[in-house]
Amino acid sequence: FSLSIIHTMSIQDNFRLAMRRYIYSVSIMSSKDDGYLNAITVSSVTSISMDPPSLLICINKSARIHDTLKIGSEFCINLLNKDQEELSNICSDEDSYDERFKDKNWNTKGVPFLANAQANIFCKVDKLSSYHTHTIVVGLVQDANYSDEISTLTYVDGNYK
């Protein structure tokens, strides 16, 4: 193993390429704001604590869902299964925004969630912290469901696995 390769790209480019080596689970963050449904594909989801149960999500400030996130607002993290690659692409494409809730597996009564996801983690926003282009969202877990079969959709080096 050697890191002796000399890179002439910017720090940002080198960092971006280094981060592409990480394998991420793929989730969709969903919420309802004044009756409007919101969903966005996220890969930056991390558990913080079991006491209290909480997680952290980073949301780009330019995302539509961003301005709906307020202290106390509710959302769901839907961990996707390997059959949900197309839905992940739809929820990450601004041009497909109106198609995000056409999948028959959405339950939109209350906080929207995907009934066929690997897991659903229901949260309330506990803290919002601005960091340059993103907001760090801390969610207090209210409930969680999971599938018995493990078949999680992952993403590495620009590809689903």
Language model features with spans:
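Basic, polyanion-binding surface patches
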Residues: 8-161
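Short, Lys/Arg-enriched N-terminal segments with co-localized hydrophobic residues
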Residues: 1-8
